[in-house]
């Protein structure tokens, strides 16, 4: 576990809110010069705490409209076959996230398709090759993700801001330059506009206008930072909650918003629980304590829950241009 101080935690927090904001602006907020902020960011990158700066955007502008989550549990598996299955998904352009899990599922794959009719052939081809190695498989369609600020990085009293609402299905027109801007920012959300203009053979004025337009249209939802939480002594936990009283769902979300470790909530269709939420926690004991508190606060509402945590991510991207080996 890497040690960081309060200033580093503040820098991470404000990068999570907007990773494209200037170093000077971050410095004013945290009480440091932009040179010191730059040094601290580079240091956290070298330590592996900061993995990369990402751009949140909806999928429709790149011609991909169906966003599907696949869960798998293995059977009759060997390490070599498991590696082969993972590589199979990594090599498919449709897969945007491939990760091995700890908890109720063994493998998660997020895939995107231009229309619903492409889903079955993709799954059919995969099952023809590896279906015998799956004890269970489940699919669900993503619709909305609400992401909240990681207020625990500052202190437990920091209030949650209004969430970034990710509505994954919107009809918005775009052109080749828009798509190339998104591709570049997907690789590095902090890429300077001057560099973007040079690489895309455009001008600073045009690129600046296009980014503002994409944000105004709701294509670009925000700019964040991928943090290796394990380097800081935390882990990511996804919790799937089934309810006895579905009408209490929003009340439960509001209650969870008071928790500084609450990171996001999801709405899905298909094999999905009534409420799916994410936390950044120190350990699984903390997760069980939180769920005990939730059940105590809503004694007639929570039926049961299950969870998973990511063991290793093999691929994470919106555009099929780079893999994690």
Describe these PLM feature segments.
Residues 1-325:
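A compositional/biophysical signature of low hydrophobicity enriched in polar/charged and small residues
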